[in-house]
From Swiss-Prot:
One of its GO terms (molecular function) is formylmethanofuran-tetrahydromethanopterin N-formyltransferase activity. It comes from the Archaea. InterPro entries: ForMFR_H4MPT_ForTrfase, ForMFR_H4MPT_ForTrfase_C, ForMFR_H4MPT_ForTrfase_fd-like, ForMFR_H4MPT_ForTrfase_N. Catalyzes the reversible transfer of a formyl group from formylmethanofuran (formyl-MFR) to tetrahydromethanopterin (H(4)MPT) to produce 5-formyl tetrahydromethanopterin (5-formyl-H(4)MPT) and methanofuran (MFR). GO terms for biological process: methanogenesis, from carbon dioxide; one-carbon metabolic process. It catalyses: N-formylmethanofuran + 5,6,7,8-tetrahydromethanopterin + H(+) = N(5)-formyl-5,6,7,8-tetrahydromethanopterin + methanofuran. Belongs to the FTR family. Homotetramer. This is Formylmethanofuran--tetrahydromethanopterin formyltransferase. Pfam families: FTR, FTR_C. Its EC number is 2.3.1.101. The keyword Transferase applies. Coiled coil: none annotated.
């Protein structure tokens, strides 16, 4: 299969189950919503070494938020609900409560699983906190130096999916990077997914385990490293490819990840110099979800 003259390899992305909390952060301006969302999702690229995977899903206009202010939806992802609640408390408490003019609302109010994160955060008020209603939602007002920090009582979570992905092969580092940026920008317009790596892009895609250093649980995926393609048996790098980037996608459900992969690939192949689109899988050893590239189109 080819799209815009770019080969779409007949392969699939392998993904795995993960627990996802969705939080809406609002602020007086989009800038401050983005600042708080960025801080709250820091150190959240991969559960290989990070305590959670996290990212900004999309921005919200004032017309769609409970308090009528600009906002940002974020997702925080862990393997277990217990760890997820801990991450919510730490990230909201340290990165959103401390940010100017922010408020926190439940991004999954209808989900079965709910954490009383707001109830716990209210104790920062040391007895001076109060209960209120905003757009029919139970919130707590916590007095702080600038006024009140508002947080909804509960934050919802669901069983989601992590590790949807595709690889972008370019004839140069800049062509591959430009295509990866275009892919991330396209995905950012959609609802339900995040791209948790720096700027949404993975420069150092890994394989599970190691060939030599057995004490590591993840190491460089040498078959996708252009600088050593002449040294690696069964390299996946064609002769005319000099850079590869991976886009990793977490999402609330399969449909959201499929839509994000499709939009990202369609954006990437419009960039001159892109030679091929592929995906990463581990023969079923990593996860139960398979997103076949050809079936996206």
């Amino acid at each position: 299969m080819e799209i815009n003259g770019v080969e779409i390899e007949d392969t699939y992305a392998e993904a795995f189950p993960i627990k996802i909390a969705r939080v809406l952060i609002t602020a007086v301006t989009k800038r401050w919503a983005q600042v708080a969302a960025t801080e709250a999702t820091g150190f959240g690229t991969s559960v290989i070494m990070c305590p959670a995977e996290a990212g900004i899903e999309r921005f919200a206009s004032p017309s769609e938020t409970p308090d009528g202010r600009p906002g940002a939806y974020i997702q925080i992802c862990t393997f277990k609900y217990e760890a997820l609640e801990e991450q919510l408390l730490e990230r909201i408490g340290q990165c959103v409560l401390t940010a100017p003019t922010t408020a926190v609302f439940n991004g999954l109010p209808d989900s079965e699983k709910q954490f009383n994160v707001g109830f716990k955060l209210k104790f920062f008020g040391d007895g001076m906190e109060s209960e209120a209603q905003i757009a029919g939602r139970k919130v707590f007002k916590v007095p702080i130096m600038e006024g009140d920090f508002v947080t909804e009582d509960n934050i919802g979570a669901i069983a989601g999916i992590a590790g949807g992905n595709f690889f972008i092969f370019g004839d140069s580092q800049m062509s591959a990077l430009t295509a990866a940026e275009a892919a991330v920008d396209a995905i950012a317009e959609l609802e339900g997914t995040i791209t948790p790596f720096p700027g949404g892009i993975v420069a150092s895609g890994s394989k599970s385990g190691a060939n030599k250093y057995k004490f590591l649980k993840a190491t460089a995926n040498e078959k996708f490293c252009p600088s050593i393609k002449d040294k690696v048996e069964n390299t996946e790098i064609p002769a005319d490819v000099n850079a590869v980037y991976e886009i990793v996608i977490n999402g609330l459900d399969e449909a959201s990840i499929k839509a994000a992969m499709k939009a990202g690939i369609e954006a990437a192949v419009t960039v001159p110099g892109i030679k091929k689109i592929s995906a990463g899988n581990y023969g079923g050893k990593l996860g139960k979800y398979q997103f076949k590239l050809h079936e996206l189109f």
